[in-house]
Amino acid sequence: MRILPACMMLALGVVPMQATGSAEEPSHLNGLWNVSVTIRNCDTGAVIRNVRALNLFVHDGSMSETSSNSRRSNSLGVWRHLRDNIYTSMFEFFRYNPDGTFATTARVTRRIELNADGTEFVTTGTVEDFDSQNVRVSVGCSTETAVRAQ
């Protein structure tokens, strides 16, 4: 008679796995992305820098990001679905001086537009830098293109 409870436990365990799997279909933002970032002067449009990055969007609304720039930390942040294929995200990371000391905290805020088949996205946003007293010391504008990692 212990077979029935064991089968019920097995069946209950399968249901959450199926729900989790469906939340990560390519039509959603969830998952790993290869990102090309361009930071510009907001007033002139002049390119300040180009950066390669990886973004990981998790189904619970959290995200992490890492970039090719060695003078900064990894990023932690949040994202949410607004409507249709439009999302927003915000993440922060630390920038360091050449000697390794703290320089600023950077906050990236962006609007994400996912393409119809869920394989690419583009963004527009801002990058704000804050000093150790949390005073904003600079702001830049950003654009990104991304492809889903395979």
List the predicted regions and their residue ranges.
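Edge beta-strand at a domain terminus
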Residues: 127-150
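A short, structured loop/turn motif at beta-sheet edges
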Residues: 25-30, 56-60, 80-87, 112-122, ...
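Acidic, glycine-rich flexible loop segments
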Residues: 89-118
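N-terminal glycine/threonine-rich, aromatic-flanked beta-hairpin/loop signature
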Residues: 45-86, 93-94, 120-121
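Tryptophan-anchored aromatic micro-motifs
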Residues: 26-45
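Bacterial N-terminal signal peptides
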Residues: 6-16
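Positively charged n-region of N-terminal signal peptides that target proteins for export
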Residues: 1-4
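Generic short beta-strand segments
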Residues: 34-40, 88-96, 124-130
